[in-house]
């Protein structure tokens, strides 16, 4: 943007338009421990210098506007403005830069992901001087994290509630996702839980449709899990999707789930919104409910490499807003997810402190100051042959969720659940004995299938199914 002539106004300020970089590009700035730091991938329009583009991002996502205004004199811009403090070119790309911006903490309302995102990823993403803009990472300071409740319970509390330790948890999304009656839906839930799964799940778009109203589904699923619990002696759960058209209706469904005594409910946090999600997370902590989070709509936001928001940012936001589980991709299944990048944000979900590691896409060290962790959920196009890789990639603190990989078993739902449970137990035992799951995985599954006809049948059905012929879109 070329500077225009400034005009001396009678009210005592210089009106006009001036380049953003004169105010918002400050390479000498030393970041504070209380600053929120952002790393943006910026693609400027032709002719726009990177310093001006970076400064424009800092300005338009904090205190700036397109022209000088006289009310600037009524506040301290130096105290409140965002600052572009560093710019680096993206290796292998022309006209693309990583721009680092520091935001003073006073710009943001305490405990509000909604407010944080409204500033940092608001109107600036439609700014004409930029061809594309992507938020790659955020550093959330401990002072701001301490204003959030975070996950309702966290990993250790969930394990204590379920009395399940030393292995990943197993789940299954009920299919077909739409069209079943409540009674048939409950039947499928019972069969999967009885067969050995820990959880079954409503799909993200199962809310309250004409073929199955929410209250009927809740009742039949509760009956199914109590019956499965009594027969297996294990604590079971079904993710009852409380997502609704209004926050009031969502809370009504969560209250009914609590009255049924079930252990867990579910929310679609991106389509439902962060305000609704945080409200539900607070209710779940106060009332002893676990909260499973689905990320429906995330790929609209995060899949393009040069524009949008990376999922690691959405994952951090979810940990702040609240959720005990969140879908995170599988690396090996049908959905997008490159290994190093996926493990980078999986660690951001689970660990208390994560070091900066650009090889995994982590731009800043992050200290969560004991905010509870979130279990990553691997789901989408996975089956028994993937079990060794999933166990090796995600470790014990995860949920491995097989929808078609359970319900597609040729002998039915319960045998499908048995096959997955046997495969998981075999992989965990082999790992504990010191065997290498990455190189010996297929051998471990074949050995286990010799004493489990259910697993043998599953191995035969899915022996040729792979999803590795497609390259990941989101790479470093």
Swiss-Prot record:
Cofactor dependence: Mg(2+)
Binding site for substrate: 123, 173, 177, 295, 327, 379
N-acetylproline modification, residue list: 3
Chief site of localization: plastid
Entry keyword set: Acetylation, Calvin cycle, Carbon dioxide fixation, Chloroplast, Disulfide bond, Lyase, Magnesium, Metal-binding, Methylation, Monooxygenase, Oxidoreductase, Photorespiration, Photosynthesis, Plastid
Binding site for Mg(2+): 201, 203-204
Post-translational modification: The disulfide bond which can form in the large chain dimeric partners within the hexadecamer appears to be associated with oxidative stress and protein turnover.
Subcellular location: Plastid, Chloroplast
UniProt cofactor note: Binds 1 Mg(2+) ion per subunit.
Pfam families according to UniProt: RuBisCO_large, RuBisCO_large_N
Gene Ontology molecular functions: magnesium ion binding; monooxygenase activity; ribulose-bisphosphate carboxylase activity
Function statement: RuBisCO catalyzes two reactions: the carboxylation of D-ribulose 1,5-bisphosphate, the primary event in carbon dioxide fixation, as well as the oxidative fragmentation of the pentose substrate in the photorespiration process. Both reactions occur simultaneously and in competition at the same active site.
Further comment found in the protein's record: The basic functional RuBisCO is composed of a large chain homodimer in a 'head-to-tail' conformation. In form I RuBisCO this homodimer is arranged in a barrel-like tetramer with the small subunits forming a tetrameric 'cap' on each end of the 'barrel'.
Name of the protein in question: Ribulose bisphosphate carboxylase large chain
Organism: Liriodendron tulipifera (Tuliptree)
């Amino acid at each position: 943007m070329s500077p225009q002539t400034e005009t001396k106004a009678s009210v005592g300020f210089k009106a006009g338009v001036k380049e953003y970089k004169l105010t918002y590009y400050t390479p000498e700035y030393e970041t504070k421990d209380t600053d929120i730091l952002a790393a943006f991938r910026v693609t400027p329009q032709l002719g726009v210098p990177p310093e001006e583009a970076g400064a424009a991002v800092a300005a338009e996502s904090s205190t700036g506007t397109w022209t000088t205004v006289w009310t600037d004199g009524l506040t301290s811009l130096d105290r409140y403005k965002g600052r572009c403090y560093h710019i680096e070119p993206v290796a292998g790309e022309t006209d693309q830069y990583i721009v680092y911006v520091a935001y003073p903490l006073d710009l943001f309302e305490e405990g509000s992901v909604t407010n944080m995102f409204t500033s940092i990823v608001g109107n600036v993403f439609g700014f004409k001087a930029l061809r594309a803009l992507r938020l790659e990472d955020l550093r959330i300071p401990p002072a701001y994290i301490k204003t959030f409740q975070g996950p309702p319970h966290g990993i250790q509390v969930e394990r204590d509630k379920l009395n399940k330790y030393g292995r990943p948890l197993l789940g299954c999304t009920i299919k077909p996702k739409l069209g079943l009656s409540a009674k048939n839906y409950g039947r499928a839930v019972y069969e999967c839980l009885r067969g050995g799964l820990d959880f079954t799940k409503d799909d993200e778009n199962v809310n309250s449709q004409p073929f199955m109203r929410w209250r009927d589904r809740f009742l039949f699923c509760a009956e199914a899990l109590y019956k499965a619990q009594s027969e297996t002696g294990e604590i079971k759960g079904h993710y009852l999707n409380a997502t609704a058209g209004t926050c009031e209706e969502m809370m009504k469904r969560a209250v009914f789930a609590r009255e049924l005594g079930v252990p867990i409910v579910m929310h679609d946090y991106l389509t439902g919104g962060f305000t609704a999600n945080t409200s539900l997370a607070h209710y779940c902590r106060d009332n002893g409910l676990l909260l499973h989070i689905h990320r429906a709509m995330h790929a609209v936001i995060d899949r393009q490499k040069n524009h949008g928001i990376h999922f690691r940012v959405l994952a951090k936001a979810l940990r702040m807003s609240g959720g005990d589980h969140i879908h995170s991709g599988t690396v090996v299944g049908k959905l997008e997810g490159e290994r190093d990048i996926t493990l980078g944000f999986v660690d951001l979900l689970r660990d208390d402190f994560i070091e900066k590691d650009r090889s995994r896409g982590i731009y800043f060290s992050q200290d969560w100051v004991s905010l509870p962790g979130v279990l990553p959920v691997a789901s989408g196009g996975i089956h028994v042959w993937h079990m060794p890789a999933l166990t090796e990639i995600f470790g014990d603190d995860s949920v491995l969720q097989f929808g078609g990989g359970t319900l597609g078993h040729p002998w039915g739902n319960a045998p499908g659940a048995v096959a997955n449970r046997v495969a998981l137990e075999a992989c965990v035992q082999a790992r504990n004995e010191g065997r290498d799951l990455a190189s010996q995985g297929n051998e471990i599954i074949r050995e286990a299938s010799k004493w489990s006809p259910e697993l043998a049948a599953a191995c035969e059905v899915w022996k040729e199914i792979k999803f590795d012929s497609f390259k990941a879109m989101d790479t470093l």
